[in-house]
Curated annotation (Swiss-Prot):
Alphabetical UniProt keywords: Nucleus, Ribosome biogenesis, rRNA processing
Database matches in InterPro entries: BRCT_dom (IPR001357), BRCT_dom_sf (IPR036420), PES (IPR010613)
Highest taxon of the lineage: Eukaryota
Key word Metal-binding present: no
Ranges where the BRCT domain occurs: 323-416
Similarity comment: family membership: Belongs to the pescadillo family.
SUPFAM superfamilies: BRCT domain
Places the protein is found: Nucleus, Nucleolus; Nucleus, Nucleoplasm
Entry protein name: Pescadillo homolog
Record-level GO BP terms: maturation of 5.8S rRNA from tricistronic rRNA transcript (SSU-rRNA, 5.8S rRNA, LSU-rRNA); maturation of LSU-rRNA from tricistronic rRNA transcript (SSU-rRNA, 5.8S rRNA, LSU-rRNA); regulation of cell cycle
Protein purpose: Component of the PeBoW complex, which is required for maturation of 28S and 5.8S ribosomal RNAs and formation of the 60S ribosome. Required for neural crest migration and eye development.
Amino acid sequence: MGGLEKKKYERGSATNYITRNKARKKLQLSLPDFRRLCILKGIYPHEPKHKKKVNKGSTAPRTFYLLKDIKFLLHEPIVGKFREYKVFVRRLRKAYGKREWDSVDRIRDNKPSYKLDHIIKERYPTFIDAVRDLDDALSMCFLFSTFPRTGKCHVQTIQLCRRLSVEFLNYVIDSRSLRKVFLSIKGIYYQADILGQTLTWITPYAFSHDHPTDVDYRVMATFTEFYTTLLGFVNFHLYQTLNLQYPPKLDSFSEVDLKSDGEDKYALETEVYMEKLAALSASLSRVIPSEPNDDTEVDEFPADPENAGLEEEQKRQLQEEEKHKSLFVGLKFFLNREVPRDALAFIIRSFGGEVSWDASVCIGATYNSTDPSITHHIVDRPSIQTQIINRYYLQPQWVFDCVNARLLLPVEDYFPGVLLPPHLSPFVHEKEGDYIPPEKLRLMAMQKGENLGLDEEDDDDDDDDEEEDDDDDEEEEDKKLRQLENKKVGQKNLNVKVTAGKVKVEDRTQVAEQEKNEEKRLAIMMMKKKEKYLYNKIMFGKKRKVREANKLALKRKAHDEAVKVERKKKAKKH
């Protein structure tokens, strides 16, 4: 009744997987084309739970894919295009070999091409899904946009990545959705809030590239091919949400302001407009010009008594968010030629500030360094020869730290030639028991509106504190001597006295704490062996974290003391 008995490895998990070579033969594709197809369709290898069973008893290392994924790829239209491209290459080589140049031109004109629109719709059914998965796409496009025009990558791909990345930056500026920025060894990390989704991407520094040899650029190019299509769709939809023209165009007033005589010297005529957009110093034009409406107010409804606290907290957070968006409103910046212009211009404009630079540095300058309305001059030099009185000369780190602190920090710590404070990461959130550096504590106090003493004032008071400590030590020694003398006198003259008793007042909080500790101890005693083992593991981890935090605190204390000693030595020399 049961039918024929199946052989070993013909049922169960062994039939759910297929090796890479078998999948490739099933699709009739070469290995590079198979990899390319899997990247575009989002198909990835899987590690079976019982690898030996799936591998039919063998322990040889093999790559496995789900059989249902490979069956899904059989119906993909791009597979046919890959085969057509294979035939195209063969015909082109044959025409080259025969030196039939007319045939070469004709075959080139009929080069097979394909679109990835249907794959984008298939992988991202809703627009929010596409926005949520934009982190890697942004990082890859920003990386490719900085590549030199060498043989490693196609020039068209580099130009496309640059155009899409500039479009996205202009959207972030117009929507004021930038939230965090961090300078790391790898590059500059940005975090933005796009339609309620948090996106984090990294952009490389503007240094010359030395292409590594251990990187497969074909795989990277395939990912970039997919990501550029995705980013193009997303940019178009994002521009529509803000009523901006797409492809982006400069505002008519901004276009007049940005006109300069040396445009043809800086870039080709075909690239001038793109370079003006990439300068990020001008606003974009809208489909229907919107009038500024600053009187918009949030509707207020009768507060629910149960959720009154939650509503107040949300209202406070909304106000802080709006305040953060307009951090640099009313401030006018000028960037010296030695500072990272692209990053600073993007950040300053994202928070409502105005920015410009010397016209000889880059196209897109809106005013020069002699403008009397400039409030902040960003420089990265030890000293400035000629300074204008009515502006601050600051190092670039001030801009980044202000964004992360969500307020305008004191400028005294960022003057040219001053030793800069540490650049704290905004992506680190300390938990209970973690080590918090003093700079972070000072910053948290500033955000709450508290005033803490500066390091310089603390250093001046060190000598006074040491003198007070010496006086306290002398008083304690005198007290101990008196106690010893009283003890000796008491041993010689033992006078028995009867004193009235006192009623002991119980501390309720202490009693409650003792009861709580007793309950906890009894609960631990009643635990099962497994639960007790897990509890001990958790407690061990917490204690280890506290020990590490204490070690860091001691190291920091020793470092601060060494710095103070060094300062005193320098002061004595002078």
